Structures are given as C-alpha cells and as structure tokens.
C-alpha cells in the first residue's frame, strides 16, 4: 500500500503464505520467519483488518516454489492508475511476478502498464510515495 490513508483505498492484493516460507530471503539477514503457522495467523488477521475497514481483498494462491511470493508490494508500483512492473532485486524473485501482472492487467482494465528492462533492478517495496 502506498503512503496514503487507509480510507482512500478500495482494493488490496495479497498472496497466501507458501509452505516454503521458512526459506524466505529475510532469513539470510537474521530476521527471517520462525513459524509458518504464526505467520499465517497474522496474515489472516491482516486480511480481516483490511476487510473490516471496507477494503475489497483479493488473495492470490501461494507459489510454494517462491518463499517470498507473499511480498506482493515488491512486484509492482501503482500510482494514479499507472503500473510499473520492476525487475526484482534478487534473481530468485523474478518468477513471482507473472501472476501479479496477470491480475493487474485483468483488474485494472485500461491502466498503463510499463515493465522495467535492461540491467536496472528494484523492488516495489523500496519506493516511498510522498504526497
């Protein structure tokens, strides 16, 4: 979600936690997942909180081949109906993007969708939107 108020949001996209979550990249930084069931319970609580706030929540299936797939914010940047699909910073995350891109193409009907190319790499979660 961008840095705007929750009451300005109508829809959210999340992805289920894969069985492989214990191998997520965060574990290499010493802060990785400890308990998948706890993570799933927290994720369900997050989904419920969004729904309680009146947000329509779409949940994509987990991809058990990609432990980081639940971090959907890294796979797209959406501002004012424009979508940027970045090349993820870590090569292991590149194949997480197609289901998210397909969803955005389908759900955002006439949105301008741009894909990064070349050697540039970026995770969408590294973007801070101001104003």
Label each region the model flagged:
Residues 1-131:
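The feature marks the mature, well-folded catalytic cores of soluble enzymes
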């Amino acid at each position: 979600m961008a840095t705007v108020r929750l009451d300005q949001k109508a829809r959210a996209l999340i992805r289920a936690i894969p069985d492989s979550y214990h191998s997520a990249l965060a574990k290499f930084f010493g802060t990785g997942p400890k308990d998948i069931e706890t993570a799933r319970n927290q994720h369900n609580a997050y989904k419920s909180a969004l729904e309680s706030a009146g947000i329509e929540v779409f949940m994509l299936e987990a991809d058990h081949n990609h432990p980081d797939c639940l971090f959907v914010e890294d796979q797209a940047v959406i501002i004012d109906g424009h979508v940027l699909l970045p090349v993820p910073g870590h090569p292991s995350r590149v194949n997480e993007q197609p289901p998210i891109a397909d969803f955005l193409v389908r759900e955002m009907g006439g949105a301008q969708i741009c894909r990064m190319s070349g050697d540039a790499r970026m995770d969408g979660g590294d973007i801070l939107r101001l104003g």
